[in-house]
Amino acid sequence: MSDKIQEEILGLVSRSNFKQCYAKLGQLQKQFPNALYFKILETYVKFKQSPGKFDYNKLLEEPYGLKGTTITGDTRSLEFLHNFFVELGKYDEALHVYERGNFKFPSYELSYHWFMKALEDSNYNQMSKASLQLAKYSDSGNLPKRAYYFWNAISILAVSRFQENTLSDPKKILLSRLARQSLLDLKPFQNVQEIIVYCLVLDELFPQSREISEEIVAITFANFDTSVNLYLKNFILKHTKLLNSPQKLFEVCSKLIEKGLDDYELITNLIDAAYKLSKSKDEVKQWIDENLGDSRNTRLARLKLDIMYTDSVSESSLSYYLSKYHNKPCCSIDLNHYSGHINIDMLKSIMSKYDPEDKDLIHHCNILELGLIGSDSINNYNKFKGTLEKKSVTDYSSCSTFLLEIVKDKCKKTNPELKDVLLCITILENYQAKDPHNFDTMCWLIVLYMYLGLVPDAYFHFINLKIKNVQTDSLDYMIFSRFSTLFPNKQSDFYSKTFHEHNNLYDTSLANLPRYIQVAFERNSYSKILGMLEMRDKLMKSYTRWTKTLENLQFSRLCNDKRGHLLQKLHEDWRSLEMTQSVSFSDNRDFSILDENFAQFLNRGKILEYANLNEESIFLTLIRELIIEALPNGEKTEQISALLKKLPSINLEELLNNNLTEVESASFLIFFEIYENNGKNLHDLISRLMKVPINAKQNWMVSHTYLTKMATLKTLDSLKRIKDKEIQKLIKNSLKELRSCCDDVFKGYSKALVQAYEELKKDECGNLLKELDVKAENVKNIKNSLLGIQKSVRNL
């Protein structure tokens, strides 16, 4: 019944039908005079009716706040109060109502609600308190009393790992001792999960010491008599090494290996310990072979043995490894790790024995990556391109390595020439037809097209990557960075389908993770919980998530769409971030798929400049959108003031120039000027915006500069706060001027692309294409793609 009533009341509020709201609530309060729930609902209605006039202290803080006099144990009232306080940004008060309710009306149900609400809010300090309360009701719950002490320990671990800034040193020491002692009182531990939690407490909450290491080694070593657990393996190995006892290290490693763990870290530590114990090399080698047999790890162990005993890899050990792995992708990775101990001439000699005619593609890639031959990308590609016809369609070939060497070399330059970018596209498009599932070349094609601002072409390859789930968070940067000023087409699948589908990852995952964590607590799957909390933290703070949210707000301004629901969602997400008590962003983007040394492609003027976003640029963009939201009211907000204080304390213009493009900086200053100084210097700043050249760089900056100007001017044009007739006229004239040059801007860019294509047939580029037997792509395809973007832009 209460859910239906709440839904009805909130529905009336959303329609601003306050008269009917009060009538309904008055009727309910007559019917249920002692029901606090309806009084709280009425208070909320008063707030929604007049937020500016709402007397927070009298109506909410005094009765229900930290020192409030009205305390309830009714869970529906507590939940509504909690949500009310959260909406107001009063996060301590939001959970304090549960704490006070438990103090006056103690019960298992109330404590459980408190714990789960704290979990939803990412408030691990409150989870710690609630879990101890739960332990008082061992007969009321579904779990034995001991379980809640493990819940408490995990909560304290979460505070220490994710919210250490909330702990003073004395409090951290107190909580650590409490967690340890409460678990010690539960000995003997009943399963591996309980042992893992206890080891985590010792490992993460206490300073490193011999006593701690001895205790962890003792408790984990005893457990390996019955089972092998990788969490415990990591604990015992780490702390056995800290004990600095070769005998104990050898004992531990040998026992785990005898249990069937073919783990290279264990093997290398076994070898280290054996050497210090003066065991012979042959004895150790024989022991490893007898217990593990033949595997990649045991073959690599021969190299480690040589290095430990003679400081150099022997010919026999190297031959033993290479006889099986010379033509496997792992070969160069493994051997480069030991390159300082391998004689280069010996390595060349042995490698040549296994492929004397140099016909094996992966073997050849390995000798190239091992530095045994010089790079000759063109000849290497031509030598092995015949293998493309023999491979399975769904496999992808290492031939791409040779072509990507050429591409990366061209793209290292600052402000690469159009003809070089088109050359790279031509080479890779030709290759992609022969190796359609090659992930590496598809990623580079996306980046190259995005550098040119040709989003439809980039999108074609992006959807062929078929990325799913968490991959979207790490790879969406390739195509959705600054998308609002690159491809403003609401009807395209790019926006209407893929953008929204990929965004669902955040909403769905963040909504479901608390439930999954709850289940893990209840099923005693303790080892999974901290990992899930970390995943939630990373998704909540994701660079990609926040940049897409802010880009979508700018996109809605550009398209004259209503932004109410987007702003509401922004504030909800921001409150969730604030509740973590660590307002920062997490860079989960994976640039290594493009190159190990990816930083060389990210700087200003580089091929990945469009995706070069950081924490400062996200904060600046967030501040810009919040300022635009606040401008109609003409009032400064605490939220914006707090965010401005988070920025580095340097000159604002310098900060903007370091983190945004020139046109983004000019746009920011316009809105900031209205917010701070009521537009005193607005005329000069608009003139400055219009002077930013659109065609200074013939690449993605053409669309980006034009559309950033357009979004800025359209937003200014819709602001009723601007009363100055001269400024109004300047805005409208600037919009007219911008729209009038649209076709010329894109025709000029199209002409530059055509001219660059013509240059592909000449000189060095033409010779390279001939050597690779590649024909230049039809320029018509790129012209049509640019024309599609031009039409979308012209309609704004």
Curated annotation (Swiss-Prot):
Q: Which UniProt keywords apply?
A: Acetylation, Cytoplasm
* GO terms, biological process: cytoskeleton organization; mitochondrion inheritance; regulation of actin cytoskeleton organization
Major subcellular location class: cytoplasm
Task: Say if the entry is tagged with keyword Cytoplasm.
Answer: yes
GO CC, alphabetical: cytoplasm; NatB complex
**In-chain residues carrying the UniProt-annotated modification N-acetylserine:** S2
* An example molecular function term from Gene Ontology annotations: acetyltransferase activator activity
Q: Where in the cell is it found?
A: Cytoplasm
User: What further fact does the record state?
Assistant: Present with 5800 molecules/cell in log phase SD medium.
Q: What does this protein do?
A: Non-catalytic subunit of the NatB N-terminal acetyltransferase, which catalyzes acetylation of the amino-terminal methionine residues of all proteins beginning with Met-Asp or Met-Glu and of some proteins beginning with Met-Asn or Met-Met. NatB acetylates TPM1 protein and regulates tropomyocin-actin interactions. MDM20 is required for mitochondrial inheritance during budding and together with TPM1, is essential for the integrity and assembly of actin cables. Genetically interacts with CIN8.
The UniProt entry's sequence similarity note says: Belongs to the MDM20/NAA25 family.
Quote the subunit structure annotation.
Component of the N-terminal acetyltransferase B (NatB) complex, which is composed of NAT3 and MDM20.
Name-wise, this protein is N-terminal acetyltransferase B complex subunit MDM20
Q: Source species, please?
A: Saccharomyces cerevisiae (strain ATCC 204508 / S288c) (Baker's yeast)
